[in-house]
Amino acid sequence: MSFPRKFGTAIHAALSFIVFFFLDLLDAILCVVYEFVDEILEENSTGCYCTAAAPQSQTTDENELSSETLFGRRNIFRGMWFLGFAREFKSKLSRKLRKSKIHQESVNRWSDCGCKSCKSWTKNEDGNLHVVVKDSTSREYSVQEPSENVIFIHGFMGSSHFWTETVFEHIQKDDYRLLAIDLLGFGESPKPRDSLYTLKDHVDTIERSVIKPYQLDSFHVVAHSMGCLIALALAAKHSNIVKSVTLVAPPYFPSSVEGSVLNRIARKRLWPPLAFGTAVMSWYEHIGRCVCFIICKHHKIWEWLIKLCIGKREIHWKIKDITRHTHHSAWHSMHNVICGGSKVADEHLETLIKSGVKIHLMQGDCDQIVPSHCSGNMKRTFPAVEVDIITGADHDSMISGRGEEFAEKLESIWCSC
């Protein structure tokens, strides 16, 4: 490595240390602030993970467990004396203020959006996921069941739009029933405050909302990013009826310690900007909640401003999807699915391969979110997995920018099963 490159790397490391040192302090202060406001505004406030200890597991099912990264994020300021003094003062003040406060329990936290659109899921009494179905079976044969069912699972901070707006229109064959879901906590699906959004929670809701009501006796699964880990868990549980699993840009870190997964996905660094944003939202619970409060709670204002700037009545579905979650659902899905789910991915892959399920992986060579070596690691560990590297594609554009080509590839995979 040349001297200028070494010097630049050293400067970047130093600046990253300074910035994240400041963010550690800010998050520790915000911890006390949010704790104070929550106790005043909420009847049953939910505690954070800053001082919580990891609970003793009562189950051997790894899919059901909370990730260790929720409890093990180091912050040197959490035990400082001035924060202890602040908490003591906060407790006395909040007790006085709570006496004169009449609480009304809400499905949302005060820092979440309570607009009609964001609370529409509360009208769904059965608690099932939002499912978009495209049944392309010809009308004259509508009495027959489609020969192929396909479940589409989106990634982090996405929704069923990721598939319906890009791929569905290009799949024209008459024997496919396409089912795109909004995962628990995202899009138009329920966002319960008492859920920990573990792999088991996601799999159970898909079973209850798709597999059972649509009586699927066989199906294919197509998933993107975080959805790949959920797809593997779902397919492994139903390995006797699943035909194929297509993984697009899966965050695969074989047999890793969960903290190591967090460091790989969201290493603390300033550059590139996308990596910095990922690190902030993954490491700092309270700063992340501030971001969600500013952007998600006030998404109507931001959408109005964007419409004003671009001069259009409607804004792109990707922009809308970014705000259609709560901090609670995004935070827990990030840690319990991406970090916690990584350590059971090998187990799920082994189950599928032993059952003879066809597994196909696709990833863009310009992906800056999921490292390109993830696909190589999976291929080395499981040679039976078919891998396609898409030249010039990044994390999303391999689908959103190549819908027709991607649909043709999917149909070829399904036909080969």
From Swiss-Prot:
Keyword Nucleotide-binding: no
Top-level class of the enzyme under EC nomenclature: hydrolase
Catalytic center residues: H154, S225 (nucleophile), D367 (charge relay system), H395 (charge relay system)
GO process terms (BP): cell wall organization; response to UV-B
Protein name: Probable lysophospholipase BODYGUARD 4
Superkingdom in the source lineage: Eukaryota
UniProt EC number: 3.1.1.-
GO molecular function, one term: hydrolase activity
One cellular component term from this protein's GO annotations in UniProt: extracellular region
Location of the AB hydrolase-1 domain: 150-259
Described purpose of this protein according to its UniProt entry: Involved in cuticle development and morphogenesis.
Protein species of origin: Arabidopsis thaliana (Mouse-ear cress)
Span of the signal peptide: 1-49
Annotated membrane topology: Lipid-anchor
